[in-house]
Amino acid sequence: MKKITKISLIIIGIILLTGCGKDSLQEISYNDLEKALNNKETFILEIAQDGCHNCEEFNPIFKKVLKKYNLTAKQINLTKLSEEENTKIENLYNITGTPTVIFIEKGEEPSISRRIIGARDEDFIITKLGIAGYIKESK
């Protein structure tokens, strides 16, 4: 009986520890984005939307790379924004499609050429993260 209790406690502990990890892709609101930009934060921003085939293809690969390099990114889901917020984001970043990954430095995008647009493979993502200075290893 004691053995079963110990095993059960160990299993529960493992489940709790593995389930409490920080998510590599954190969905934020428009207000959260505004605060981060106004505070001149540096972060990775993914712009996505529900029903986007490219987003569905890209996100598992993107999350895998973020986890591999112990990085986090903020995600804005255009589908969950008001029409006004959506327009502001599209105008601010001149979004042509989703997913779009933007590298923000001190509240601004230093270069449009650093973006990741559309569903891209792991090597491409790693290269862009390297160019943006988030990882040292780039292929």
Q: How would you label these PLM feature ranges?
A:
Residues 21-23:
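Bacterial signal peptide processing site
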Residues 90-104:
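Structural micro-motif
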Residues 7-14:
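Sec-dependent N-terminal signal peptides
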Residues 16-19:
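C-terminal motif of bacterial Sec signal peptides marking the signal peptidase cleavage site
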Residues 102-139:
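Non-catalytic, surface beta->alpha helical segment in thiol-disulfide oxidoreductase systems
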Residues 1-6:
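Positively charged n-region of N-terminal signal peptides that target proteins for export
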Residues 34-71:
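Local sequence-structure signature of Cys/Sec-based thiol-disulfide redox active-site neighborhoods
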Residues 47, 70-86:
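Thiol-based oxidoreductase modules, predominantly thioredoxin-like and allied folds used
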